């Protein structure tokens, strides 16, 4: 890595520390702080960092680890608890949203392939931002938070399915569409075959590694398979994120996946922070100034439409008015998975640079607005509506806040110690 690239990364992390501290004081989610860091640097040094290939590579690792952790943490029991919000609410949201975008295709404004793609991009939400706000407000166990999580699980699955379909959708738009379609199909079969083989051998290898008693080997093995599957997926014409997700699912069936999650969390957080920073770095200030009004109108239209659609979706499932409204507002933004889809679609010509800039800017604005909307709508519904079940049980605890501002440090240390204890217990159980 060139010396200048290292200097750039040091400067970015230094700026991120300052911005995150300020964001914490303002009660903002860390993801917003990272995006603001990128926005500041894109204004201060518009050319020094945007062309930095090493930084882009590190941010791609953030995407890889994000999908890896999604696969690793995918829990059938969690799906069972949230099945109503996940499959019914999530599918209704997807159908209604794609129905709206298909209307633009019928008017001849975009192609039908783009209508489907844009529909999937728009339904994605940043639960990292919403859940952080819910956690800070003591609402993490509230009905609207659980509803948001359920719908987000459906969105995660839809992202993975779309990452599989993008090469096939792109093949239809190329001159050599049939041959490209065959190549994509062959690549998917090879990837599926490798996954089937790994399905049987990964748990055996992981068990052997745990029996060695060397914790570092668990981390190295997880990183090796994660990056290995990601690289294989890209070599076969798919995204690295898809391969990482498949690897996470394969390791998920192992009895040791809790300590894999704990041991690799620090890697994920570092690279994921770079991904959010890169979102801000990609902000084109000149484009934003020249197209300010259209971007603002698009942001308002998307957030309003998503709130209404999510409200309708959750009400049809049977959730009460306040839960549906707060869930709709909380995930009305276009989240990080929307960027992942757009980045994957760009090389295939499924989305133009202009469309990427418009949707990307709207996504950034929507994520920055989400905390204020959640707080505002929550206060509004408390003033004019009935309290939620969580509030009735706890009283007005949503206004209370942790007294210890360093509680997250203790939580991190506790997670680390718990991971070590889980590792030792697993090792003792196998040796006994």
What are these regions (language model features)?
Residues 1-411, 416-424, 431:
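Transmembrane helical cores of multi-pass secondary ion antiporters/exchangers
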